[in-house]
């Protein structure tokens, strides 16, 4: 009989064998802060237009080369629970605003780094948290006073493109003017009168070859597909959409047929042919000249479609089918029945075209009032086009934010330095120990212009001292000049480097909430990981290809 070994007294004896627990400042708080600092340091070098790219290979061995913090974090699959909280805050920023994810990480990391200094000199966690929350509220009070301009007309392509430039610059520095114009054209063309803009209505089609300057905007949809039949171009298209295969109905039972004469053999499939002919003719008689199907196309059905001059397009993706229905105003039919007028879609032209060496089917609306617009991106490599697509995504999300709130604040670290200056002054007036935390909160804002300066290769301390000097004189819109070879500053409003008010508001709020949540943790209790055999490493999950 095995000897019973008693567990050590204390918290551990209440837990299952193999469970771990950490408590106190040294074991829990400082450990969590260290993990968050490491994560923030990773993405900090990717901040701003001159940020470095990260090469990430995910669990499916897919390669990502990008400086987009949201993509990096999504593919890294962070496991540490405290670092995960900051990752979740950045995901919330992406859902709420669509841009500014790296700001959340860098700012939250700076807040925690400075909180550690305060804790080590003797402040309690509750005093640091209270100071941070007071400072966050103060920052939100100050922020409306820093608004330098507002978007006047969101239906003017030139004005919109100038406002989108900054968000694209951080991903595609050098191509921002061209891309901003493309995105502005796409967004303005489908911006409804109601003012409710849906980002899913801007589609991106990536076609390998040529260069980024060959990219274009189409009002309608583009699919990397070929037509099934002989008809490759239709003007004034009336479109019937089917979610079923374009084929005759067959019984599920199997049967054996005895054929005795040559005449019986000749007439054997004639009934099936006549039925298929009648079905396709009925569709053609409704006026439909384009059929889009979500299933396979039978050879016999294809023959009759060619006979009645019907253009056939097959889309394998049900999402593409839904988007096409939305674009052309059609209803997807589950059975091969003739569509009524209300179920048919319409667009100005459907044609098979060649972009580079890729065949594409284009559903085009000549008038700029279509429900969906497509940006056709060209590029030399897939990774480059993926990165351009992320820049387009940021630009479209910025337009969406501007439809909700047209206010803009100066970029380039100008807003952060002004907030730091004013919150520091406010901290001086606070009597309690919270004033130290309030001042550290203000100091954390310096992390943003510091990251911009370091990534641009100039001395950060010189830049920050110059910014403070200019802001003390009352120039609220002056920020870092990233194009200068020496530490220099310039007016961000004149340079057109502007951030959305909502983006800044939510980034400060979410970063502070994440930092405070991490600081509130004083114990970590981890159950023993579940046992059992590990899944074989060579085989992938059946649904892994969907995540790719």
Swiss-Prot record:
Keyword annotations: Acetylation, ATP-binding, Cell projection, Chaperone, Cilium, Cytoplasm, Cytoskeleton, Hydrolase, Isopeptide bond, Magnesium, Metal-binding, Nucleotide-binding, Phosphoprotein, Ubl conjugation
Reaction(s) catalysed (UniProt annotation): ATP + H2O = ADP + phosphate + H(+)
Gene Ontology CC terms: centrosome; chaperonin-containing T-complex; cilium
Residues modified to N6-acetyllysine: 318, 400, 466
Positions where Phosphoserine occurs in the chain: 23, 162, 213, 269, 317, 537
N-acetylalanine found at: 2
Annotated segments matching region Disordered: 529-548
Main location: cytoplasm
Modified residues (Phosphotyrosine): 30, 505
Enzyme Commission number(s): 3.6.1.-
Residues bound to ADP: 47-48, 100-103, 169-171, 412, 499
Spans traversing the lipid bilayer: none
Cross-link annotation Glycyl lysine isopeptide (Lys-Gly) (interchain with G-Cter in SUMO2), location: 224, 254, 260, 534, 539
Cross-link (Glycyl lysine isopeptide (Lys-Gly) (interchain with G-Cter in SUMO1)): 459
InterPro entries cross-referenced by the UniProt entry: Chap_CCT_theta, Chaperone_TCP-1, Chaperonin_TCP-1_CS, Cpn60/GroEL/TCP-1, GroEL-like_apical_dom_sf, GROEL-like_equatorial_sf, TCP-1-like_intermed_sf
Record localization: Cytoplasm; Cytoplasm, Cytoskeleton, Microtubule organizing center, Centrosome; Cytoplasm, Cytoskeleton, Cilium basal body
Keyword Ion transport among UniProt keywords: no
Binding residue positions for Mg(2+): 99
Pfam family, one: Cpn60_TCP1
Role played: Component of the chaperonin-containing T-complex (TRiC), a molecular chaperone complex that assists the folding of actin, tubulin and other proteins upon ATP hydrolysis. The TRiC complex mediates the folding of WRAP53/TCAB1, thereby regulating telomere maintenance. As part of the TRiC complex may play a role in the assembly of BBSome, a complex involved in ciliogenesis regulating transports vesicles to the cilia.
Assembly and oligomerization: Component of the chaperonin-containing T-complex (TRiC), a hexadecamer composed of two identical back-to-back stacked rings enclosing a protein folding chamber. Each ring is made up of eight different subunits: TCP1/CCT1, CCT2, CCT3, CCT4, CCT5, CCT6A/CCT6, CCT7, CCT8. Interacts with PACRG. Interacts with DNAAF4. Interacts with synaptic plasticity regulator PANTS.
Family designation: Belongs to the TCP-1 chaperonin family.
Protein's UniProt name: T-complex protein 1 subunit theta
């Amino acid at each position: 009989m095995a000897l019973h070994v008693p567990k050590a007294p204390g918290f551990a004896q209440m837990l299952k064998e193999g469970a771990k627990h950490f408590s106190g400042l040294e074991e829990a708080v400082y450990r969590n802060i260290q993990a968050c600092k490491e994560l923030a340091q990773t993405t900090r070098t990717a901040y701003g237009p001159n940020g470095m790219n990260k090469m990430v290979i995910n669990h499916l061995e897919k390669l990502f080369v990008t400086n987009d913090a949201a993509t990096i974090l999504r593919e890294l699959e962070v496991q540490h629970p405290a670092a995960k909280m900051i990752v979740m805050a950045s995901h919330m920023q992406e859902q709420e605003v669509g841009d500014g994810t790296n700001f959340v990480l860098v700012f939250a990391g700076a807040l925690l780094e400075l909180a550690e200094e305060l804790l080590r000199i003797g402040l309690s966690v509750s005093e640091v948290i209270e100071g941070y929350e007071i400072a966050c509220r103060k920052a939100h009070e100050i922020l409306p006073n820093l608004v330098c301009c507002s978007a006047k007309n969101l239906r003017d392509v030139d004005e919109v493109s100038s406002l989108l430039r900054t968000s694209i610059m951080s991903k595609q520095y050098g191509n921002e003017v061209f891309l901003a114009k493309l995105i502005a054209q796409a967004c303005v063309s489908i911006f409804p009168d109601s003012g409710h803009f849906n980002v899913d209505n801007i589609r991106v089609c990536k076609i390998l070859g040529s260069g980024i300057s060959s990219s274009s905007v189409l009002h309608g949809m583009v699919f990397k597909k070929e037509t099934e039949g002989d008809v490759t171009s239709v003007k004034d298209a009336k479109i019937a959409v089917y979610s079923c295969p374009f084929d005759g109905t067959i019984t599920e039972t199997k049967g054996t047929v005895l054929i005795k004469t040559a005449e019986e053999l000749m007439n054997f499939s004639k009934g099936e042919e006549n039925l298929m002919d009648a079905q396709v003719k009925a569709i053609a008689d409704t006026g439909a000249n384009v059929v889009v199907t979500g299933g396979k196309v039978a050879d016999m059905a294809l023959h009759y479609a060619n006979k009645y001059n019907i253009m056939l397009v097959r889309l394998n993706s049900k999402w593409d089918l839904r988007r096409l229905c939305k674009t052309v105003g059609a209803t997807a039919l589950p059975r091969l029945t003739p569509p009524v007028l209300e179920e048919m879609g319409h667009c100005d032209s459907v044609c098979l075209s060649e972009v580079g060496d890729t065949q594409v089917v284009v559903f085009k609306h000549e008038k700029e009032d279509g429900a969906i617009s497509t940006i056709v991106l060209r590029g030399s490599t897939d990774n480059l086009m993926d990165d351009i697509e992320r820049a387009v995504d940021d630009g479209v999300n910025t337009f969406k934010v501007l439809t909700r709130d047209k206010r803009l604040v100066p970029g380039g670290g100008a807003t952060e330095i002004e907030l730091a200056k004013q919150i520091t002054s406010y901290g001086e007036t606070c009597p309690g120990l919270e004033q130290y935390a309030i001042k550290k909160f203000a100091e954390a804002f310096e992390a943003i212009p510091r990251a911009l300066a370091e990534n641009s290769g100039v001395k950060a301390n010189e830049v920050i001292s110059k910014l403070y000097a200019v802001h003390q004189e009352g120039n609220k819109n002056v920020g870092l000049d990233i194009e200068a070879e020496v530490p220099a500053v310039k007016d961000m409003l004149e340079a057109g480097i502007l951030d959305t008010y909502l983006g800044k508001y939510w980034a400060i709020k979410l970063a502070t909430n994440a930092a405070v949540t991490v600081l509130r943790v004083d114990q970590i209790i981890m159950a023993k990981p579940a046992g059992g055999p590990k899944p074989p490493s060579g085989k992938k999950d059946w649904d892994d290809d969907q995540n790719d």
